[in-house]
């Protein structure tokens, strides 16, 4: 059952903290949480808009840090469901990647070199940005795919994992 401590109808970090002793008493030694980062929640938080900000519906970054502290105090573990394959279209990286002028985020996502043509076995969006090309999406149209590169390139627009865009994506996700 959800523990809602602020009356908005959604379980939150403080609610989990209040139930930790009960969870421990059940014999659990770990808690696995759904994505709890800032998100427009078009897919239950799996469309992350900011990996460095807790979703306000669950609490603050300070509340999340306190949750970690309280969990560890009880010799338990906490696992956060990290979504490294895509972000939300609301993510600042994606907004920058959509710009026509090259910038540090241009190759952070997987873009084709043309808005025309059908991609085999890949969902994509076209006509949503200033730049030429379509962006590959994961699962839903509001989840643009992050670019980690392609080991077996079959298209000219696919980048190697060692190219600057994929390397920057990997380096940033390692910081998350």
What is each stretch, according to the model?
Residues 2-5, 22-66, 76, 84-91:
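Aromatic-lined carbohydrate-binding/catalytic grooves of carbohydrate-active enzymes
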Residues 5, 9, 101:
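Acidic, glycine-anchored loop motifs typical of Ca2+
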Residues 71-80:
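Transmembrane beta-barrel strand/turn architecture of Gram-negative outer membrane proteins
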Residues 21-38, 121-137:
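Conserved oxyanion/phosphate-binding beta-strand-loop segments in alpha/beta enzyme cores
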Residues 88-176:
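Alpha-amylase-like alpha-glycosidases and glucanotransferases acting on alpha-linked glucans and related
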Residues 32, 79, 142, 146:
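Conserved Rossmann-like nucleotide-binding pocket used by diverse enzymes
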Residues 16-19, 63, 67, 169-176:
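Alpha-helical packing segments of well-folded alpha/beta enzyme cores
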